[in-house]
């Protein structure tokens, strides 16, 4: 089933320039009009195109660079947490990952600890707001954790955030592990690290 591309124009109230912003919805990023619009950088925040191969569809559509707002794995040009390893960026990078929100919390916490004390290993727990891949009411699911209502349950689940720190700080690769407790808030999370 192919859905049609949806387009609209948005005019922000009170905008003195009276500029209209195009709003687009397209299941296949390679069909977006990035070339026509002169787009330099796409922020890929759907969670559906979180690898270099998949995010490159934006490049095929005419964007010059893509920043994935999720862990991108080892195939992206770089995984970057600003303030921790942003110096690894190169002008030739076309698809980079900004890791996850939890990795962006954990990496700045663990870097100075490792630099000044040394981290041999650690366990991280994140108390995390629920996310859009969770169900809002109890439903059937083969993974019982995924069957519970995000709006009424505290749900223990896995997270790749601790492992993703190894992509940002290679000297810690394989030394951190962690889990998440998804809680009934739509925003705000915290990280607890034992090392």
What are these regions (language model features)?
Residues 1-135, 139-147:
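N-terminal Rossmann-like NAD(P) cofactor-binding subdomain of oxidoreductases
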Residues 116, 121-125, 134-195:
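C-terminal substrate-binding/catalytic lobe of Rossmann-fold NAD(P)-dependent dehydrogenases
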């Amino acid at each position: 089933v192919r859905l049609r591309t949806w387009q609209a124009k948005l005019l922000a109230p009170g905008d003195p320039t009276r500029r209209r912003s195009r709003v687009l919805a397209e299941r296949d990023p390679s069909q977006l009009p990035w070339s026509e619009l002169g787009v330099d950088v796409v922020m890929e925040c759907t969670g559906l195109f979180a690898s270099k191969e998949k995010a490159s569809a934006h490049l095929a559509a005419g964007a010059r660079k893509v920043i994935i707002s999720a862990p991108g794995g080892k195939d992206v040009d770089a995984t970057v947490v600003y303030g921790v390893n942003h110096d690894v960026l190169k002008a030739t990078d076309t698809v980079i990952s900004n890791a996850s929100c939890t990795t962006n919390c954990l990496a700045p916490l663990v870097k100075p600890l490792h630099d000044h004390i040394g981290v041999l290993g650690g366990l991280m727990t994140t108390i995390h707001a629920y996310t859009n891949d969770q169900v809002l009411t109890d439903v059937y699911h083969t993974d019982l954790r995924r069957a519970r209502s995000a709006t009424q349950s505290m749900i223990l689940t896995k997270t790749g955030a601790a492992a993703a720190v190894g992509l940002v700080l290679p000297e810690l690769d394989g030394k951190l592990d962690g889990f998440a407790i998804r809680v009934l808030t739509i925003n705000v999370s915290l990280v607890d690290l034992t090392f």
